[in-house]
Each structure stands twice: as structure tokens, then as C-alpha cells.
UniProtKB/Swiss-Prot annotation:
Belongs to the MshB deacetylase family. Zn(2+) binds at residues 15, 18, 157. Binds 1 zinc ion per subunit. The lineage of its organism: Bacteria, Bacillati, Actinomycetota, Actinomycetes, Pseudonocardiales. One of its GO terms (molecular function) is zinc ion binding. Keywords: Hydrolase, Metal-binding, Zinc. This is 1D-myo-inositol 2-acetamido-2-deoxy-alpha-D-glucopyranoside deacetylase 1. It catalyses: 1D-myo-inositol 2-acetamido-2-deoxy-alpha-D-glucopyranoside + H2O = 1D-myo-inositol 2-amino-2-deoxy-alpha-D-glucopyranoside + acetate. InterPro entries: GlcNAc_PI_deacetylase-related, LmbE-like_dom_sf, Mycothiol_biosynthesis_MshB.
Length: 303
């Protein structure tokens, strides 16, 4: 297959910061190779917990201004990753962060009383129609979202999966849909490296306490090592949600970790992982565009 249209990648994420946490290296890699990368964010992340003491008044149970603040964080992160365009599903503020509860380490569930505008309880058909409109506008060949379980059970991630699968099925331009997933094996290796690092300030979890899928289920492993500096810059842009730690970091080499508000370490690794949900698997082992006949694998300067 050879495509005459330029390569375009669209990623559907639930909240500001998810684009970086789940797919930041991938975004930076393809943007550096001339791919038009579009991020669709489904909510403003209004229900997020706030890490810095001096900003906790923004939280939903106080001034309820966190969503607007996180829009600025998202813009900074997208600039660091060189995102071509970022849109909010249905427009800014159409759907609200649904919030979540932790059932156990690494597994979330829905709140018992959702906000009336909560994304997870909104009209799924309206949401799918809004995404279909964006898919027809940008015409991506490749779309990325979460797996059916949302990665770790967050209701907004689950709804993002449902909406994406429904909308993408209606748009012929979409040739592949991938689910972003953590690799159990890579998470385990990353945690082992953090255990050997001196001065790592976060709580070190057991591997099974972090989300992950068996490596045999993974269809695509994207090397993002060259683009970790961009991902780390984007992680730092989400300062209300993410804390970063680096040891002997030098242009992508070293040990790095981040933690969310729970203070639990998660390793920054050189690869990001995907499961092909729809489309032809041939050629996609290391490249989301592999086998599609588009220039999505070579750096722009090498063409």
C-alpha cells in the first residue's frame, strides 16, 4: 500500500497530561519526522489532585479553577512535543473530568455521584459524533487511544476508548487504530533500575501495582529514546499533576522517574507500546505507520 496523502496521526486522550504520560515520546518522534500530529483532549482535567501546595486552591473542592489552569499546562506540553494542533472534544469545557476512586494500587473506578457534565456519563453518541467531525477534518491514517479497560479503569479513559472506536469505524481515512498500553516487562525493568538509583525520592511500587499488559499482547514497540528530553519537558509542563526526578541525565541517557499525586514512582523508559486494534498488522512492529507506504519513520533532515 502506498498513500499519496501526507502522514497524519491523531491521538484521543481523556485529560491534559495523558497525551504526555501515555504517548509523549511517540508524539515527539513522529512530529520530528514531519507527521502532522493532532491531540484531542476530552476534558479539562478539573477533578485532578493538585501537587504544589501554593496551587491547591485551584482544586475542584475549593475554587474549582483547575481546568482552566491545566489548559495552559497542556499548551506548554504540546509545544514541547511539537504537536501540530490540539482540540478539546466538543469544544473547551463541553465535558467535565468525571473523577475516580482508587480501588487498589493501579486500579481505578468511577465515583458514585458524577457531575452532570461528566464525560463518562455524557451522551456517547454526541461524543462520537464530535470526534467523527474531527476525524473527517484532519483525516488521520492512524488513531491512538486507550484499551477497553482504559489502561487502569478510569471511567474517562474507558469512555474515550468507546468513543474513539465508534467514531473511527465511520471514517474510511482511518486505516489503523492503536491502543496505548504499558508493557509489563518494561515496567519491571524500569522499576529495577530505579531500585538501584541513589536518592530516588518517590515510593517504589511492586511491578504488579502499576498498570501493564503482558508483552506477548503488544504488537508495536516504538523507540522514543531520542525524544525523551521532549517528553520530560512536557511532563514538567504538567506541574500540577506530575513530579519529575532525574539521575545523571544527559541527552536521553540516565535514569528518570515521575510520580503523580500519590507519590508512587513510575519509570521513564525508552519505548512506548501499542496493541493494534483495527487495521492491517503487516509492517507495524516498530512503526505505527509501517507498511502503509508513508514517510513516517525517517527524520525530516534525512529526506
Amino acid at each position: 500500500m502506498t498513500l499519496t496523502a501526507p502522514p497524519r496521526l491523531l491521538l484521543v486522550h481523556a485529560h491534559p497530561d495523558d497525551e504526555t504520560l501515555w504517548t509523549g515520546g511517540t508524539i515527539a518522534r513522529y512530529a520530528a519526522r514531519g507527521v502532522q500530529v493532532v491531540v484531542v483532549t476530552c476534558t479539562l482535567g478539573e477533578e485532578g489532585e493538585v501537587i504544589p501546595d501554593n496551587l491547591r486552591g485551584l482544586a475542584a473542592d475549593q475554587a474549582d479553577q483547575l481546568g482552566g489552569y491545566r489548559v495552559g499546562e497542556l499548551r506548554s506540553a504540546c509545544a514541547a512535543l511539537r504537536v501540530a494542533d490540539q482540540r478539546f472534544l466538543g469544544g473547551v469545557g463541553r465535558w467535565r473530568d468525571s473523577g475516580m476512586l482508587w480501588e487498589k494500587p493501579g486500579q481505578a473506578s468511577a465515583l458514585p455521584d458524577a457531575h452532570p457534565r461528566a464525560f463518562a456519563v455524557g451522551d456517547a453518541d454526541e461524543q462520537a459524533d464530535a470526534l467523527e467531525e474531527l476525524l473527517r477534518e484532519f483525516r488521520p491514517q492512524v488513531v491512538v487511544t486507550y484499551a477497553a479497560d482504559g489502561g487502569y479503569g478510569h471511567p474517562d479513559h474507558i469512555r474515550a476508548h468507546e468513543v474513539t472506536m465508534a467514531a473511527a469505524a465511520k471514517v474510511p481515512d482511518v486505516l489503523r487504530v492503536f491502543h496505548a498500553v504499558p508493557s509489563q516487562g518494561v515496567v519491571k525493568e524500569g522499576l529495577a533500575a530505579l531500585a538501584e538509583a541513589e536518592g530516588m525520592p518517590f515510593e517504589l511500587p511492586e511491578p504488579h501495582e502499576l498498570p501493564g499488559v503482558p508483552d506477548e499482547r503488544i504488537t508495536t514497540v516504538v523507540d522514543v529514546g531520542e525524544h525523551l528530553p521532549a517528553k520530560i519537558s512536557a511532563l514538567r509542563a504538567h506541574g500540577t499533576q506530575v513530579k519529575m526526578w532525574l539521575e545523571q541525565w544527559n541527552n536521553g541517557a540516565g535514569v528518570a522517574a515521575y510520580a503523580l499525586s500519590n507519590g508512587v514512582a513510575q519509570p521513564v523508559v525508552n519505548t512506548e507500546h501499542y496493541v493494534l486494534a483495527t487495521g492491517d498488522q503487516q509492517g507495524c512492529e516498530t512503526d505505527l505507520f509501517g507498511g502503509l507506504g508513508v514517510s513516517g519513520t525517517e527524520p525530516v533532515g534525512a529526506r
